[in-house]
Every structure is written in C-alpha cells, then in structure tokens.
C-alpha cells in the first residue's frame, strides 16, 4: 500500500492560521478589542518592514509566546482570532493602534519602553510606535 502526500494548496488559510496562532498565544484571546489591536499591530509591522504578516509572526525577537502549539483550533477564542486575522488580511480591519509596531503587557516594563510613551492601551497591553 502506498500513501500519497496531500499538499494544502490554500496558502491564504495556512497564513491566516499561522498568524492567528501567534495572536492567540500572545493575547490569550482576552477580548475582541485586544485581538483586533494586536492583529493591527502585526499589519503595521509588515507594512513598515515591507514584508508579509506571516514573516512578521515568525520573528522570535518580537513574539516570545509563539512556540505554544497547544491551541485547540475548534475553541471559540481561537476562532475569534482566525476571523479577525482573516478580516485584516482582506483589508477590512481598521488600525486601532494608530500605527503602533511595538507592544508589551502593562505588568512588564522592558528596557526599550522606559523612556517612551505608549499610544494605545487595550485591555492591559500597551502599544508603541
């Protein structure tokens, strides 16, 4: 018996799920406004660097929680992330973080953020230019 490897030819769905996994891992899908803000920031980074959002979420220096693969794809929270990313990829998600390209949780204070003012605070996540 021989098995044939079936390739997924739907690259858009693959990209959406990769980005949604990072959004879910970083935000915990705490709320829709937070998921929208984080997704907007990913789009801002991609636009500012001239790369795709999939390449952005692969950057381990930006996204520390990206290695968590314990996401249940059927969960309501993860599906919220998928829908939000899909909206962003189609250009239907407004930038709710005013061009921000950096973030951290309010309970943390990385060195780079000490002398900067944040431009958006969404559910305890701070966004910076």
Predicted feature residues:
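Bacterial extracytoplasmic/cell-wall-associated proteins, especially those involved in peptidoglycan
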Residues: 3-129
